């Protein structure tokens, strides 16, 4: 396998092996939750530390990008065509695998940039856009995958038309989960309340991560992010970089945080405050409709639900 090839110093061979099963190794090596996936299944982790599979995947993926390793092998074209809706990680992985199997593949992306959550959602400090994402997408295109942006399936074209007059044999829908979920508490409509999805999209689109850009994003002096997942960590760490005093509010204890341990560790290193066992009940505002505070109640853990 690829780890054996790394041990032997055969990095080109390692890249060839990993490319057979991983379409975006440099991306996955950075942002996937390895501790609950590949590394979580490593038997060495029973008594000690598991093999750092994610870090090795990242190294091999980056080596492949830097050294221009040969593109993955593809089967002869079978004459069948598949339309892929969405250019996020699911769409890119699907398109890559199908192209390797000999299918003609075209990705339709609604927005003007390719990459989905890799470009609009995950911050630059976790996933470099030009150095990593753009080059991984170029690797997918090297397999013969076509990509068309600014196409809203359902408006510009329809699934029926893709399967009909456009001549596709199948359609893969990988449109993502872009709609946010709110808490349903009073005050959520106040100015200054935004979903993490919107905040991160604005930050990435407006290049808030680049010091040379004057980014017109409203960030208060004190920012509270409600939640404890990876998106919450991305949002709170982005707010910190934009100059805010940033705090995580989470209804359970640190042990129950769904975010990766690595992300929580980085957030603490950067000075993010954590208010655990704290649950918001209302967003407070002034007479002009702007946020002034967050009313919360203290929680305590009970027995797990059946």
Which residues are covered by each model-predicted region?
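FAD-binding core/adjacent interface of flavoenzyme oxidoreductases
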Residues: 2, 26-30, 35-85, 100-101, ...
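Residue-level detector of alpha-helix initiation sites
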Residues: 23, 88-90, 113, 229-231
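Predominantly flavin-linked oxidoreductase catalytic cores and closely associated redox partners
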Residues: 208, 213-226, 230-246
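A Rossmann-like FAD-binding core segment of flavoenzymes
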Residues: 132-181, 198, 204-214, 241-306
């Amino acid at each position: 396998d690829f780890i054996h090839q790394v041990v032997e110093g055969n990095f080109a061979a390692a890249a060839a092996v990993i490319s057979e099963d991983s379409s975006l190794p440099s991306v996955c090596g950075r942002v996937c939750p390895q501790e609950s996936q590949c590394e979580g299944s490593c038997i060495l982790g029973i008594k000690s530390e598991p093999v750092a599979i994610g870090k090795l995947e990242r190294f091999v993926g980056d080596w492949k990008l830097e050294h221009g390793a040969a593109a993955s092998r593809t089967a002869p074209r079978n004459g069948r065509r598949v339309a892929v809706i969405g250019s996020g990680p699911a769409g890119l992985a699907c398109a890559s695998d199908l192209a390797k199997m000999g299918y003609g593949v075209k990705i339709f992306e609604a927005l003007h940039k390719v990459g989905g959550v890799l470009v609009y959602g995950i911050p630059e400090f976790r996933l470099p856009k030009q150095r990593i994402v753009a080059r991984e997408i170029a690797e997918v295109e090297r397999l013969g995958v076509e990509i068309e942006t600014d196409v809203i399936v359902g408006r510009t074209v329809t699934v029926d038309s893709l399967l009909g007059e456009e001549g596709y044999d199948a359609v893969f829908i990988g449109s993502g989960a872009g709609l946010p979920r709110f808490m349903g508490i009073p005050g959520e409509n106040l100015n200054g309340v935004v979903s993490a999805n919107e905040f991160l999209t604005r930050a990435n689109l407006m290049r808030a991560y680049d010091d040379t850009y004057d980014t017109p994003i409203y960030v208060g002096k004190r920012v509270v992010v409600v939640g404890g997942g990876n998106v919450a960590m991305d949002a709170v760490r982005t707010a910190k970089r934009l100059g805010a005093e940033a705090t995580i509010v989470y209804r359970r204890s640190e042990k129950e945080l769904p975010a990766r341990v690595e992300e929580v560790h980085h957030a603490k290193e950067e000075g993010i405050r954590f208010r655990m066992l704290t649950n918001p009940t209302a967003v407070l505002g002034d007479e002009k409709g702007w946020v002034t505070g967050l009313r919360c109640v203290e929680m305590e853990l009970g027995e797990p639900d059946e």
